[in-house]
Curated annotation (Swiss-Prot):
Its cofactor is Mg(2+). GO terms for molecular function: 3-methyl-2-oxobutanoate hydroxymethyltransferase activity; magnesium ion binding. SUPFAM superfamilies: Phosphoenolpyruvate/pyruvate domain. Its main location: cytoplasm. One of its GO terms (biological process) is pantothenate biosynthetic process. It comes from Rippkaea orientalis (strain PCC 8801 / RF-1). Its EC number is 2.1.2.11. Gene3D superfamilies: Phosphoenolpyruvate-binding domains. This is 3-methyl-2-oxobutanoate hydroxymethyltransferase.
Length: 257
């Protein structure tokens, strides 16, 4: 059965943890979908893991759509959500509607994700959801704000924690169907999760969220450098290097084909 938004709410109500991972191409998406991942995120992190940029900022909406199309072709069951990249929605509400509309119409994704919980972001969410565009929110560490906030943990002071709680509540009231909590203290994530009726998806936010997401390149051990809160379940980088070295040796020594 294909994943739906009501299932996510039901999962929270019934205490079933949600599994989310990122994908950037057809092959990875097909594998994640076949493994029963609930949510596949076409994250703007692909700017770094697939395109070699140092931050997520350079990736364009056209590039995100290109990758999301490939991901959606590989998915039969999982819910696909695509990030709106930097400066594809911040300029105006009309720009956000055009960008989100393009993603849904051109890719087949079921929703979009945007960062931040400030007043402009909340208004944007309200407008998008009012015309039927499903939106996932994202608070805490927001990579599109890297030059202002850096990659450090957010919500460490009482003032910052209260701000993030207020943002989370405002985003739920604006209509987001789920909320990513990135790199915030465990107790803060637990508080937010208990206050919301929508599911929270944690990344570096502890065990008390309604689900967890990782960048798949980190999970597979493909990344040269990964965040301290990520976990590698495989050293795929080493396995690929080993396989390529063995192939090269066999070719050069006349053993293959």
């Amino acid at each position: 059965m294909a994943m739906t938004l009501p299932y996510l709410i039901q999962a929270k109500q019934q205490g079933r943890p949600l599994v989310a991972l990122t994908a950037w191409d057809y092959a990875i998406a097909q594998l994640l979908d076949g493994a029963g991942v609930d949510i596949i995120l076409v994250g703007d992190s692909l700017a770094m893991v697939a395109l070699g940029h140092r931050t997520t900022l350079p990736i364009t909406l056209d590039e995100m759509i290109h990758h999301a199309k490939a991901v959606c072709r590989g998915v039969k069951q999982s819910l696909v959500v695509c990030d709106l990249p930097f400066l594809s929605y911040q300029e105006s509400i009309s720009q956000a509607i055009r960008s989100a509309g393009r993603v849904l119409k051109e890719t087949g994704a079921q929703g979009v994700k945007l960062e931040g919980g400030h007043a402009v972001a909340v208004e944007t969410v309200q407008q998008l959801t009012s015309i039927g565009i499903p939106v996932m929110g994202h608070v805490g560490l927001t990579p599109q704000s890297v030059h202002r906030l850096g990659y450090r943990q957010q919500g460490q002071t009482e003032i910052d924690a209260e701000r993030i709680i207020s943002e989370a509540i405002a985003l739920e009231n604006a209509g987001v169907f789920a909320l990513v909590l990135e790199h915030i203290p465990i107790n803060l994530a637990a508080t937010i999760t208990s206050k919301l009726s929508i599911p929270t998806i944690g990344i570096g936010a502890g065990p008390h969220c309604d689900g967890q997401v990782l960048v798949t390149a980190d999970l597979l051990g493909l990344s040269k450098k990964q965040p301290p809160f990520a976990k590698s379940y495989l050293n795929l980088r080493g396995l690929i290097t080993e396989a390529v070295n063995e192939f090269s040796r066999e070719v050069r020594e006349g053993e293959f084909p």
